[in-house]
Amino acid sequence: MASETKAPSEEPTSSSNKDESARFECNICLDAAKDAVVSLCGHLFCWPCLSQWLDTRPNNQVCPVCKSAIDGNKVVPIYGRGGDSSDPRKKVPPRPKGQRSEPPPQSFAGFNWGGDGGMMGGGGPNVHFSFGIGTVNGLFPLMFMLPFIQGIFPLSFVASFFGNGNQGAAAAGGGNGGGNDGNDGTHAHTHGHTHGPRGHGESAAPGSRMAQEEEYLSNIFKYIGFFMLFWLLFV
């Protein structure tokens, strides 16, 4: 019976010890206060914890518990018997060393369009460099297709069409010149071929009006071809 009556009396004693030890815990780290200081509002802190709290909130220095104003001059150090009698606020709390993570170095990959195998080699993913007008993989095929685009453009058809008439005019001039030295029959025969079609292998005489028109049309269609090429690149 004595043991049964003694057991209930031990439980309140242990709980009271926990309550007593909790009174001396830091309100920030919830551990036994080291270099203890008490704020004017009555809350206990470790000076290293409170100093870090104030340093990280320079524009909002309030008590972590009741949000009243607090700073290093508004706390009172607690000196226990047999402990250090120096003011903990004069100590600089140990701070962790700053760790700055350096970004990985970015090396220029060069003009290795085909990956690891070089410009023409394969085996790796294609490298894309954006210049604002599309990728390089799309730019180079269009550059190589430019002569082909000029070939299939109506330029060749228009030049040959107007060139046939120019060749006929040149043949007319040659026929008239030959008629002066020959007889009338030869002149009539040559003059009959004046308006005929120009041969496919002949071209307009340099400096003639037809040659200038051919050059003008060639430049126009060349500009149109360049315009379409840039339109394909940008759009």
From Swiss-Prot:
- Zn-finger regions (RING-type) at which positions? 26-67
* Tissue specificity of this protein: Expressed in body wall muscles.
Here the segments flagged for biased composition (Basic residues) are 188-198
Where are the annotated segments for Disordered? Answer: 77-115, 173-208
Keyword Transferase tagged? yes
Superkingdom field? Eukaryota
Q: Which one GO biological process term can you cite for this protein?
A: protein ubiquitination
Pathway field:
Protein modification; protein ubiquitination
Mention one GO molecular function: ubiquitin protein ligase activity
**This enzyme's EC code(s):** 2.3.2.27
Where does it live in the cell? Cell junction; Cell junction, Focal adhesion; Cell membrane
Please give the knockout or disruption phenotype noted for this protein.
RNAi-mediated knockdown leads to disorganized muscle dense bodies and abnormal muscle-muscle cell boundaries. Accumulation of unc-95 in the muscle cell bodies.
The main location is other
Gly residues composition bias: which ranges?
173-182
Classification via Pfam families: zf-C3HC4
* Catalytic activity line of the entry: S-ubiquitinyl-[E2 ubiquitin-conjugating enzyme]-L-cysteine + [acceptor protein]-L-lysine = [E2 ubiquitin-conjugating enzyme]-L-cysteine + N(6)-ubiquitinyl-[acceptor protein]-L-lysine
Role noted for this protein: E3 ubiquitin ligase that plays a role in the maintenance of muscle cell boundaries and muscle dense bodies, which establish the adhesion sites of the muscle cells to the extracellular matrix. Ubiquitinates the LIM domain protein unc-95, thereby regulating its dislocalization from muscle dense bodies and weakening the link between the muscle cells and the hypodermis. Regulation of unc-95 dissociation from muscle dense bodies by ubiquitination plays an important role in ecdysis during molting. Plays a role in the cessation of distal tip cell migration at the end of larval morphogenesis.
Q: Its family? A: Belongs to the RNF5 family.
Q: What is this protein called?
A: E3 ubiquitin ligase rnf-5
Q: Which organism is it from?
A: Caenorhabditis elegans
Taxonomic lineage of this organism? Eukaryota, Metazoa, Ecdysozoa, Nematoda, Chromadorea
What is the gene name? rnf-5
